[in-house]
């Protein structure tokens, strides 16, 4: 109901599109948030949590699980203008900024630009073995379907998840703890920030910035994620678009923060300082 109210309040339908193309449907919102991340920082093995904190991504881990409102996101995409990178609303222009990225979902925005290589020193299979301790099997062909576990830097998410069962063994050596931490990091980055249209695969390319793991806090992940979001919003604003990726939870939380009359119930948890990101204030409905 709230999404419908927002659509009525914010959307002025393009009449040419309405009569020539028909009313566009809802966009498919690509987002992956695995069950083992739902417990946040407090629900994680403290050995893994320590490494994620050292990587500077503990704020993102604190963001609670929420279902995406496809209607809300579609309504906002309808008002997105690629030429200005902003939402054109009846009362003026608004956009999502780096401040929103840091304050709402706790992603660091200060540091070096996220610029690396797209081809590893040897092969992505070797890189996966080095960073995560597991080597994907060789390419297999089943009929006309490519069943390869790894394509470039992208690994089948289910295969990778099966390599890291919960819980972490009590007597796990530090090398295994670091591999688990890198797995959680790549799941957070690939599922919450840099989600693309290939929902069954996840890229390990980001792990080059976490060698060692503490090196990750030197980079502005918020800047990279915001650029990725702008790209997906621009692509999704095309009339032929059917789906959208990127940090869509930020888009939803941004709308809740900017239009409080449509947000669900807010909570004010009793927590020790420093407080977590703004996202923890919302109870998804």
Can you say where each PLM-predicted feature lies in the sequence?
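N-terminal leader regions that mediate targeting or early regulatory function
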Residues: 1-230
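Short, intrinsically disordered/low-complexity patches at protein termini
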Residues: 127-128, 134, 253, 274-278
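Short, charged low-complexity intrinsically disordered segments located at boundaries
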Residues: 130-136, 215-220, 241, 256-264, ...
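Extended, charge-rich alpha-helical regions
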Residues: 146-166, 256, 261-285
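Amphipathic alpha-helical segments in well-ordered regions
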Residues: 192, 254-257
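Hydrophobic, mid-to-C-terminal alpha-helical segments
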Residues: 200-253, 263-273
